[in-house]
């Protein structure tokens, strides 16, 4: 069952991270699988977890970049690096997160993450 307040909060947060069109596309992709799953994504991940107190949004996004690098999930990694840049993370901060990950995730995942990052920067025109 949809929680309207959390849903609105989640939509607002997703728009802040990915831009309204980018976030709308994410939600629509998940809705293809299941409407309730899309609501859960919006309300839980974006409406509850990413809006908690204790860490600012940029720091949360950098934590997500680190986790996705360690897990080797490159498709989501690109999206989260882009989101981190959108909420104020610098290229230097992202590079340092990726470098830090070689200690815990290994060289192959670190280098794969750098490839994702470099391609994203190229696509963003940098």
Where do the language-model regions lie?
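Structural motif
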Residues: 53-58, 88-92
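Extended intrinsically disordered, low-complexity coil regions enriched in Ser, Thr, Gly, Ala
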Residues: 74-92, 111-115
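Short acidic alpha-helix initiation/capping motifs at coil-to-helix transition points
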Residues: 39-42, 71-77
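Acidic, glycine/proline-rich low-complexity segments that act as flexible tails and inter-domain linkers
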Residues: 1-57, 110-126
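Short, structured motif recognition centered on aromatic/hydrophobic residues
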Residues: 60-68, 98
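Short helix-coil transition sites and intra-membrane helix breaks within transmembrane domains
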Residues: 55, 71-75, 106-108
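Preference for long, well-ordered alpha-helical segments
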Residues: 93-117
């Amino acid at each position: 069952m949809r929680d309207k307040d959390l849903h609105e909060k989640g939509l607002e947060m997703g728009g802040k991270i990915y831009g309204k069109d980018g976030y709308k596309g994410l939600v629509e992709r998940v809705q293809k699988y299941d409407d309730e799953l899309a609501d859960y994504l919006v309300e839980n991940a974006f409406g509850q977890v990413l809006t908690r107190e204790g860490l600012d949004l940029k720091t949360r996004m950098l934590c997500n970049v680190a986790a996705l690098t360690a897990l080797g999930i490159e498709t989501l990694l690109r999206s989260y690096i882009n989101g981190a840049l959108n909420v104020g993370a610098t290229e230097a901060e992202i590079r340092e997160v990726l470098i830090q990950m070689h200690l815990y995730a290994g060289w192959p995942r670190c280098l794969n993450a750098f490839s994702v990052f470099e391609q994203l920067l190229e696509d963003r025109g940098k």
